[in-house]
A protein has these predicted regions:
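Short acidic DE-rich linear segments
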Residues: 202-206
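Alpha-solenoid HEAT/Armadillo-like helical repeat scaffolds in large eukaryotic proteins
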Residues: 8-12, 16, 39-47, 69-78, ...
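Core helices of alpha-solenoid repeat scaffolds
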Residues: 5-6, 37, 67, 103-107, ...
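Structural detector for internal amphipathic alpha-helices that build alpha-solenoid repeat scaffolds
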Residues: 1-3, 11, 19-33, 38, ...
Length: 206
């Protein structure tokens, strides 16, 4: 009978209404954490995009409990769709709980995903690291200085979203590096302009 109740929640997860999906996975987190998380991870291979995206959101609601299982799946899977979904679930966790500490194995899995054979996974990883925040700064800075302009551009935009006093100074230093790709440099200039504009809009202490 109890498992039937969980099965009903998984049926609700496939509902097209995002509110019903949210109610379902929040009930899973509250009442069925041990049983629901492995099933949600199993749905990351789901060809139904609506259900797969709902599963990513659901995993994100589990917070710290999802970090190590996601690392294991991300490193083990040969399916690029599953790997991309793992990365997106990491972004959900970080978005839901700003400042949450990612354990070393989770950061290592994300670091390895930066050089994934799938460009979709690699770029999604950069965006996820932007959600992780200050803890991900060293990895993002390495990407900006790397030889993949598409990833570097995504990394600049991710860095610009992190609230850390060293970001602006670091981007200005990178802007003056001669080896930086011209498109990446333009992105840095745009990011710095946005950051300056944001600072100008903030109320000054009286």
């Amino acid at each position: 009978m109890e498992m039937e109740a969980l099965d009903i929640l998984f049926e609700d997860l496939a509902h097209p209404n995002p509110y019903i999906q949210s109610q379902a996975f929040m009930a899973m987190v509250r009442d069925w954490p041990q049983q629901a998380l492995p099933r949600l991870l199993g749905l990351l291979a789901q060809p139904n995009i609506t259900l797969r995206r709902a599963s990513v959101r659901g995993i994100g609601a589990f917070g710290a409990a999802a970090l190590l299982p996601l690392a294991d799946l991300l490193k083990a899977s040969t399916d690029s769709t599953i790997r991309a979904s793992c990365v997106k679930a990491y972004a959900q966790v970080a978005s839901n709980q700003p400042g949450i500490h990612f354990p070393e194995s989770a950061m290592k899995a994300l670091e390895e995903a930066l050089s994934d054979d799938s460009p979709v996974v690699a770029v999604a990883t950069v965006m996820a690291l932007g959600q992780v925040g200050g803890q991900a700064m060293p990895l993002l800075l390495r990407v900006v200085g790397g030889d993949n302009p598409a990833q570097a551009v995504a990394a600049v935009n991710a860095l610009a979203q992190i609230d850390h006093p060293a970001i602006e100074r670091t981007l200005r230093d990178l802007q003056n590096q001669p080896q930086v790709d011209s498109y990446v440099r333009e992105t840095i200039e745009s990011a710095l302009a946005r950051m300056s504009d944001l600072h100008a809009r903030q109320p000054q202490p009286g």
